[in-house]
Amino acid sequence: AKGPIKGFWIEAGYVTKNRGQDKPGNQIFAPNGFRRFFGLKKGKSSSTHIGEIAFETETGPLVTKNYRENDNGMEKLTLPKPEDHGFGVYDGKVLVFEPKGKRFLLTVVELDDFERVYGHRLANVSRMTGGRRFGELT
């Protein structure tokens, strides 16, 4: 082991245009169980709502977004609107989440930079069915 887990990450891949064709998308599918990284538990009823996540970013407002179960056995993570936080788009980038008290600091990194910046901290890397990778940071 490389030490305690200090964060986690997921490759965004293609992001659906859930806000309309003219705006960058802000929802990604995460693997079943990804909620545990956020300290969330599976919903008790038939509701798809799992909980809320409070995000902090380097620029832009604090934002709280929903986390849901999806009917395809995956989980749906709604992120802050990328244009409000200097991220441009999420497509093809890596989303890094680091706990800060009750919030999560969201950093968005180009795929090429991710290995260089975080490569030495990667732990428990897994791959989703569609090929996107996710894992933890030490």
Model features per residue range: what roles?
Residues 1-138:
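Intrinsically disordered, charged low-complexity linkers and terminal tails
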